[in-house]
Regions:
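Conserved helicase ATPase motor motifs in RecA-like P-loop NTPase domains
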Residues: 76-82
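RNA-binding accessory domains that recognize and position tRNA/RNA substrates
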Residues: 1-50, 54-60, 64-65, 70-72, ...
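Active-site regions of oxyanion-processing enzymes, predominantly non-cytosolic
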Residues: 316
């Protein structure tokens, strides 16, 4: 199987490059930037991509690849920091420049292989503080922006390319076409990566694990698909456990029980942990601490269950690529954005190995696998939900009052989107609440009430997202229902921040 190898220099978009390439049915793998030449050769890449990153090439501790990579006679594309590595390696000069974050117009100077069919100009997403002052002698400029005269370069043999912008994010017009040009036309990679093949290989590999597997299921698509993949491989050696942590959506506990007991043929146990979780969260306001508390309590309950119902050899989790990259667990130098409750090493005293069959996949790939495994349709269309639940949709301390407000308000948002036939067209929609209050008028009296924030976004894979432009009439209807049906709420706001710079969840 042909493969594109992406060297991770710490960009939060590194996995997104792989994701985009997989859309072409070409396998892409992310590896550490300092991979040895020997190990890179073993991967036998059809092409190599250098990701972006937060470093500057002129820093003494700047991450750099093995210089012999450029002698492999394999096409190379450098993105942002990767572009600067190429310039620096071939004798050009990088300088500190005015930071450029956001959209810029890229003017095409030469329809090189990677810019073939792109047109005269496109909007490109910039995220950098350095730029090429002088390009190497053997290179030519193939694209520029107002602030970057060498935003795209290519060597004269058309085998090494550097671009200062990010083609992998949806904010770059025709960015997918640029990557496709590199992968399919420059690298000539075969398109033979499919989810059907992934399922086949995963089942074969999982069938080799020894002992019994304990799988925590949340009722979401990630953990459900992970459980079904494992069950397909090892059958009744899998035990699924659902923990009601008191942080779920309205009526979700009952829906999960019905789905597993009536639709899916797996061993299933429900544990009521509401009091345990909420008591541990009492007084906790820091978002990272809340995530850690939720993660620790899941581990504590699984440990107790394992001791009483074991022995188990593995603990299975529905960890995805975005979870890993946002938690900084990838092997590149990425900064931690936030810690996901199901990522990272388990404590030694748990005595269980981790099984994460979806760790290298993105959300939409998981949805494709769900269809292959005949997952119920209502689960396929349900919006993503964070592992720590409503704890990260409540700003400040988690209280029963805030949980009730968030549940009811989120349910109103979902109902109105469904009534407008828009629920399946958006990626995610929910309500969040914090500690701030605002004055309102009820009857002839003033009162202070909670502020509810409505967050609705469009996305492909959760790595980037754009806020959804709803009709004003629908926003008004949602707002009126929330303030009329929830006594504690006086104000409703609509969040218009995209990812980046914001994240999809508030915490």
């Amino acid at each position: 199987m042909d493969k594109i190898v992406v060297l991770d220099f710490g960009s939060q978009y590194s996995h997104l490059i792989c994701r985009r390439i997989r859309d072409f049915s070409v396998y892409a793998e992310l590896v550490p930037f300092d991979i040895s030449l020997e190990n890179l050769n073993k991967l036998n890449p059809k092409g190599i991509i250098f990701s972006g990153g937060p470093s500057s090439v002129y820093d003494s501790n700047a991450p750099v690849p093995d210089g012999k990579i450029f002698q492999l006679n394999v096409p190379i594309l450098g993105i942002c920091y990767g572009h600067q590595i190429i310039v620096n390696n071939f004798g050009g000069k990088i300088k500190r420049a005015n930071k450029e974050y956001g959209s810029s117009v890229l003017t095409i100077d030469n329809n090189s292989d990677i810019l073939n069919g792109i047109g005269d100009s496109v909007r490109a997403w910039m995220s950098h503080g350095d730029e090429a002052e002088d390009i190497p002698e053997d290179f030519e400029i193939i694209g520029h922006t107002e602030n970057s005269r060498s935003a795209a370069i290519a060597n004269k043999q058309k085998t090494v390319f550097g671009i200062q912008f990010h083609p992998e994010v949806v904010h770059t017009e025709k960015g997918t076409e640029i990557l496709k040009n590199f992968v399919l036309k420059v690298c000539n990679a075969n398109q033979n990566w499919t989810m059907e093949k992934f399922v086949e290989n995963s089942v074969e590999n999982i069938s080799k694990v020894d002992g019994n597997v304990l799988c925590g299921v949340s009722g979401g698509i990630d953990s459900t698909v992970a459980a079904l993949l494992i069950h397909k491989a090892i059958g009744n050696r899998l035990k699924c456990v659902f923990i009601d942590n008191g942080l779920l959506r309205l009526n979700e506990v009952e829906e999960i029980e019905n789905m597993f007991n009536k639709n899916l043929e797996v061993n299933f146990t429900k544990i009521d942990g509401q009091e345990q979780f909420l008591s541990k969260l009492k007084g906790v306001t820091d978002p990272e601490e809340k995530r850690k508390v939720v993660g620790e309590e899941f581990v504590n309950i699984f440990t107790k269950f394992s001791k009483e119902n074991g022995p188990f050899t593995y603990l299975a989790q529905g960890t995805l690529y975005p979870d890993v990259i946002e938690s900084g667990v990838s092997k590149g130098p990425a900064d931690v954005i936030k810690t996901h409750h199901n990522v990272g090493g388990l404590p030694d005293w748990l005595h269980l190995k981790v099984l994460e069959p979806l760790r290298e996949l993105y959300k939409d790939e998981v949805r494709n696998i769900a269809k292959i495994l005949d997952v119920p349709e209502n689960l396929l269309t349900r919006h993503p939900f964070p592992g720590p639940g409503l704890a990260v949709r409540i700003i400040g301390e988690v209280t029963k009052k805030k949980l009730d407000i968030t549940r009811i308000a989120s349910n109103i948002v979902e109902e109105e989107l469904q009534n407008a036939e828009l629920y399946d067209k958006v990626w995610q929609a929910y309500a969040a609440v914090g500690d701030d209050k605002a004055v309102g008028v009820v009857g002839d009296e003033r009162k202070y009430g909670n502020i509810v924030m409505i967050r609705i976004v469009d996305s492909i894979d959760a790595m980037t997202a754009d806020w959804t432009r709803l009709p004003n009439e629908l926003i008004e209807k949602i707002s009126n229902r929330i303030t009329n049906e929830i006594d504690e709420v006086t104000w409703v706001s609509y969040v218009v921040s995209s990812k980046p710079p914001a994240t999809i969840e508030p915490q």
